[in-house]
Amino acid sequence: MKHIITPYEHTNDTARNNSDCPDVVLPEEIFFTISIIGVLENLIVLLAVVKNKNLQCPMYFFICSLAISDMLGSLYKILENILIMFRNRGYLQPRGNFESTADDIIDCMFILSLLGSIFSLSVIAADRYITIFHALQYHSIVTMRRTIITLTVIWIFCTGSGIAMVIFSHHVPTVLTFTSLFPLMLVFILCLYIHMFLLARSHARKISTLPRANMKGAITLTILLGVFIFCWAPFILHVLLMTFCPNNPYCVCYMSLFQINGMLIMCNAVIDPFIYAFRSPELRDAFKKMFSCHRYQ
C-alpha cells in the first residue's frame, strides 16, 4: 500500500514549508535491529508451542496466531531494508517490474500483520470470555477442530483482504476499510468487556470460584490489547491524516513523526512475547526447557 505506508516524503512540499516541524529521522539500523529481535522472539514462541504438547491447546494456538502476525510485521521491515539496500547498490532497476512486485508483496505482509493482529486479539478475547463464563462447557465449545477452522478462515480472509488492499490501495474506500477495522476490533472487545463486567457483577460468587488462571488470562489479554493500541494507533492516525489532510500544516507536523510511529509498530512485536512469558508459567517452563536442551514429554 504505497501511499498508505510510504512515509512523510510524499507530502506536499508547500505544506512542509508551512510547518515548523522538521522530519524526525531514525537510523535504519534501529529498525533493522528491532525487527530481527521481533522475528527471533516470536519464532521462539512458535517453537515452544510446537515442541511442547502441553501447550498445544486452543488458547496457545490463538497466541501463535498473534505471534505470526507480529513476526510478519517485523519481516516486512527486514525485507524492505534488504530491497532498499539492493536498489542503492544498483542490483535492482529503480521502479522496475521486480521492485514493484516485491513492494506489493512486502506491503501485503504489512497489512497481513495488522489484520492478523486484529482478528487474533478478537478470538483471544472471545476465548477468554468463554473460559470465564462457560468454564464447564469450554472444552466442548472450543475444540481443536473449531480452533483450526477458525484460524484457517481468519488467515484466508486476511490474505485475500491484504491482496485486495494492495491492488486498490489508491482508493479512499480502501483506506477507510483498512483503518476502520482497528476501531471495530476495539468496539467488539469493549462490548465483550462490558458484558463480562455486567455478568461478573451478577455472578460474583461464581466468578470467585473460577481458577486463577482463567482470570489471569483475561488480564493478559487486557495488557496485550493496551500494548497493541499504544503501538498501532499513531500509525492508523497517520494514515487518516495522509488521506484527508495531507497539505494541512498541523497534519504535516504530526506526519513528521512517521518513523517514530513505525518504530512503535516494530516494538509491538518485541513486547508481546515478554507479556506471554511473564504471564504464563507454562510458556516460561517451555522456554527454559528449550534453552536448557531438555527433552519434552
UniProtKB/Swiss-Prot annotation:
Q: Which UniProt keywords apply?
A: Cell membrane, Disulfide bond, G-protein coupled receptor, Glycoprotein, Lipoprotein, Membrane, Palmitate, Receptor, Transducer, Transmembrane, Transmembrane helix, Ubl conjugation
Q: Where are the transmembrane segments?
A: 24-49, 59-79, 105-126, 148-168, 181-199, 218-244, 257-278
Q: GO biological process: what's one of them?
A: adenylate cyclase-activating G protein-coupled receptor signaling pathway
Q: Which residues lie on this side of the membrane: Cytoplasmic?
A: 50-58, 127-147, 200-217, 279-297
Entry keyword annotation includes Repeat = no
Cysteine disulfide partners in this protein: C21-C253, C245-C251
Q: What is its main location?
A: membrane
Q: Tell me the residue ranges located in the Extracellular compartment per UniProt.
A: 1-23, 80-104, 169-180, 245-256
Membrane-protein topology: Multi-pass membrane protein
Q: Name one Pfam family in it.
A: 7tm_1
Glycans attached where?
Answer: N12, N17
Q: Which GO terms describe its cellular component?
A: plasma membrane
Q: Where in the cell is it found?
A: Cell membrane
One term of GO molecular function:
corticotropin receptor activity
Q: How does it assemble?
A: Homodimer. Interacts with corticotropin (ACTH). Interacts with MRAP; this interaction targets MC2R to the plasma membrane. Interacts with MRAP2; competing with MRAP for binding to MC2R and impairing the binding of corticotropin (ACTH).
Q: What does this protein do?
A: Hormone receptor primarily expressed in adrenal cortex that plays a key role in regulating adrenocortical function. Upon corticotropin (ACTH) binding, facilitates the release of adrenal glucocorticoids, including cortisol and corticosterone. In addition, MC2R is required for fetal and neonatal adrenal gland development. Mechanistically, activates adenylate cyclase (cAMP), the MAPK cascade as well as the cAMP-dependent protein kinase A pathway leading to steroidogenic factor 1/NR5A1-mediated transcriptional activation.
Membership in a protein family: Belongs to the G-protein coupled receptor 1 family.
Name this protein carries in UniProt: Adrenocorticotropic hormone receptor
What is the originating organism of this protein? Mesocricetus auratus (Golden hamster)
Question: Which gene produces this protein?
Answer: MC2R
